[in-house]
């Protein structure tokens, strides 16, 4: 990997990323390397033992532990949540009575992430579930995919707590971390060995370069959906379970082969198939790489990013952990160079815009959003533009104006590319769809669904 190590070093400089750790699991063997520094303010070198925040990759671990309860027949994916949490209630009575764990794993519950501040104590997930009685629906139950960063998996965690009689952090240690030998992996900030931990960084301009983030961790309420910290080896050890019918590297059974198949094969379609893939499975994203099915688990926190790709047909898993910079462009470049060296299938490029697309632009125009997010889509000069309104504090944090305008380039009747003028911002993909009432009813980007507001 000598050539690739040098290449990653060049890319770190190009993208303003302090460090990256790249690893590959092939035929049961792990190899990898680290380049750069864990913290620009100290100059501490990154190593393959450096601990990074994994963000929403956490959901794969939580789903794996939840599926153990399915194996044990303690829970049924298609039974209402109320079967296990009798007092469960959101604003919609029908959703309260019928939403299931499968809806939560699929991100199709439609429940708004309206849970207030449940605090940092051990009962945080119990408090979250108790505090959502007024949570409204973003969309009807099961109608479309709309990513839930924290709430959906917090409800799953509370089910786990009730059935196991322990707090979620203890459950994860008992069910996964210890049996898998994940000695560098933890589920909340207080457990992290700070001497080994990477620091998150932001980059607002090439002149300034990467700077340490002013907020160094997510709140505890994100735990089951985003608070795992891990090393490259531990991430790939977890991937081993999916490539080997539920078995750990030492042969320990983590989940039945049937449970692994269910996690991979139970799927719901994604409105936007281009950023990740065409479907969402149970704790995994389903990708189509030139006809080869690949499973993804991704995560980002404030200034840290984690990417995992599992390739059952090739018996390969690859992972990348970074502490800053753009996400998609960097990881795709690094992964494709690694995959080329491995003579494996590479990641497809985003589609090209259809310059000849004949669209009725008025059907897309409108305001879409959810609490804290607002998108305005407008036609001008025969083109569609999207204006994102940022919270003033978020704009200051990112070094951006309060309103950011993008052109939407059509790929199809419902899909668009959204390139940025900012060299440190990735091109996004956008789906605008559901014309049952004339104008589009939903805008889906970065996995989040935003209903029409006006």
Model segments located where?
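Short, conserved catalytic-motif segment at the N-terminal edge
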Residues: 1-54, 74-76, 90-91, 125-136, ...
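Hydrophobic (often cysteine-bearing) scaffold residues that line and stabilize catalytic clefts
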Residues: 4, 54, 58, 62, ...
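Short, small/polar residue-rich loop motifs at catalytic or cofactor-binding pockets
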Residues: 16-19, 302-305, 373
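Short, surface-exposed loop or secondary-structure junction motifs
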Residues: 29-35, 39-40, 92-302, 307
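Short, glycine/proline-biased beta-turn/loop segments that scaffold the active-site neighborhood
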Residues: 77-92, 180
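Short, well-ordered beta-strand elements
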Residues: 296-298, 307-324, 443-445
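Peripheral terminal and inter-domain segments
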Residues: 313, 329-454
């Amino acid at each position: 990997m000598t050539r690739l190590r040098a290449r990653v070093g060049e890319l770190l400089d190009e993208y303003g990323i302090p460090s990256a750790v790249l690893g590959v699991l092939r035929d049961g063997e792990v190899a990898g390397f680290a380049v750069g520094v864990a913290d620009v303010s100290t100059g501490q070198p990154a190593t393959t033992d450096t601990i990074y925040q994994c963000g929403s990759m956490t959901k794969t671990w939580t789903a794996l532990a939840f599926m153990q309860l399915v194996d044990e027949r303690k829970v049924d994916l298609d039974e209402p949540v109320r079967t296990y949490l009798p007092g469960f209630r959101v604003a919609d009575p029908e959703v309260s009575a019928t939403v299931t764990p499968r809806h939560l794993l699929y991100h199709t519950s439609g429940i708004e992430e309206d849970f207030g501040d449940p605090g940092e104590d051990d009962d945080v997930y119990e408090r979250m579930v108790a505090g959502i009685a007024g949570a409204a629906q973003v969309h009807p139950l099961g109608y479309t995919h709309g990513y839930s960063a924290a709430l959906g998996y917090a409800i799953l965690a509370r089910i786990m707590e009730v059935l196991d009689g322990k707090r979620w952090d203890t459950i994860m240690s008992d069910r996964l971390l210890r049996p898998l030998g994940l000695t560098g992996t933890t589920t909340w900030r207080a457990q992290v060995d700070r001497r080994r931990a990477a620091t998150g960084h932001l980059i607002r301009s090439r002149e300034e370069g990467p700077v340490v983030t002013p907020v160094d961790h997510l709140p505890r309420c994100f735990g089951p959906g985003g608070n795992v910290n891990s090393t490259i080896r531990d991430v790939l050890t977890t991937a081993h379970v999916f490539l080997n019918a539920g078995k750990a590297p030492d042969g320990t059974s983590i989940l039945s082969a049937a449970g692994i198949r269910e996690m991979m094969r139970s799927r719901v379609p994604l409105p936007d198939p281009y950023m990740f893939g065409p479907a969402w499975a149970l704790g995994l994203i389903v990708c189509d790489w030139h006809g080869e099915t690949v499973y993804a688990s991704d995560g980002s926190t404030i200034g840290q990013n984690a990417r995992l790709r599992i390739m059952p047909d090739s018996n390969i898993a690859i992972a990348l952990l970074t502490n800053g910079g753009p996400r998609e462009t960097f990881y795709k470049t690094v992964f494709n160079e690694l995959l080329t060296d491995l003579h494996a299938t590479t990641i497809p490029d985003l589609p090209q815009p259809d310059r000849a697309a004949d669209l009725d632009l008025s059907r897309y125009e409108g305001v879409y959003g959810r609490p804290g997010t607002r998108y305005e889509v407008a036609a001008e000069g025969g083109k569609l533009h999207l204006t994102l309104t940022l919270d003033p504090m978020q704009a200051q944090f990112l070094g951006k104006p309060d309103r950011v305008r993008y052109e939407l380039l059509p790929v199809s009747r419902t899909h668009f590319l959204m390139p940025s003028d900012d060299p440190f911002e990735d091109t996004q993909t956008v789906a605008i769809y559901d014309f049952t009432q004339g104008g589009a009813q939903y805008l889906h980007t970065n996995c989040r669904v935003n209903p029409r507001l006006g």
